[in-house]
A protein has these predicted regions:
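Active-site-proximal loop/turn and secondary-structure-junction residues that shape catalytic pockets
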Residues: 78
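Structured helix-beta-strand junction loops
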Residues: 21-22, 66-67, 130
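A generic "binding-loop/recognition-motif" signal
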Residues: 56-57, 139
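Charged, gly/pro-rich active-site loop segments
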Residues: 1-10, 81-164
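Short, basic/aromatic recognition patches
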Residues: 2-26
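Short beta-strand segments
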Residues: 23-56, 64, 71-75, 84-87
């Protein structure tokens, strides 16, 4: 996918809303044995990258260092007319950092009040001497809004056939 196409998809207001306000993504990657994994994980959107963080010793760190291609989805909506999703494919770069990455704390701030956040940050700083900062750079992006008719192409094609 071309950079301008990626930028276009990411700039759609609904995509921006999901990227900046949702607290969870589902990250897909290949495990060390070559089988797929999908995990829910908190994230932070920097404007250019999706950043997730975890313990430096987490199994996903070694798996992503070995195979950096990933996919993720950020979604919302409980009914078909409310269903929205940003699907991203890209490469993950893993950096082991001292302490707690700021993006990890920023992701938590989206869902915690000030008191809970202070306790969470203190607990994290006590627990983690190091963390893995995993930055995912999009190489393909699609925003879907089922209620607004922004559907995957195959569904658009099926819907078009039904209207003939």
């Amino acid at each position: 996918m071309e950079r301008h196409d990626i930028a276009y998809e990411l700039a759609i207001p609904g995509a921006q809303e999901l990227l900046t306000s949702a607290s969870m993504t589902r990250l897909a990657y290949l495990g060390p044995d070559g089988t797929p994994r999908v995990i829910p994980i908190g994230f932070y959107w920097t404007g250019d990258q999706v950043v997730v963080s975890t313990a430096a010793t987490a199994p996903k760190v070694a798996a992503l260092q070995a195979r950096s291609d990933v996919a993720l989805t950020i979604d919302a909506g409980e009914t078909p007319d409310q269903a929205r999703s940003v699907s991203i494919r890209g490469r993950a770069s893993v950096e082991i950092v001292d302490g707690v990455p700021e993006e990890y704390l920023a992701a938590a701030r989206k869902i915690m009040d000030a008191g809970a956040m202070a306790q969470f940050e203190q607990a994290c700083r006590e627990m983690y001497d190091q963390m893995a900062r995993i930055a995912i750079t999009p190489s393909w992006v699609r925003y879907f809004d089922f209620g607004a008719g922004r559907l995957p192409r195959f569904l658009q094609d099926l819907a078009g056939q039904g209207q003939r």
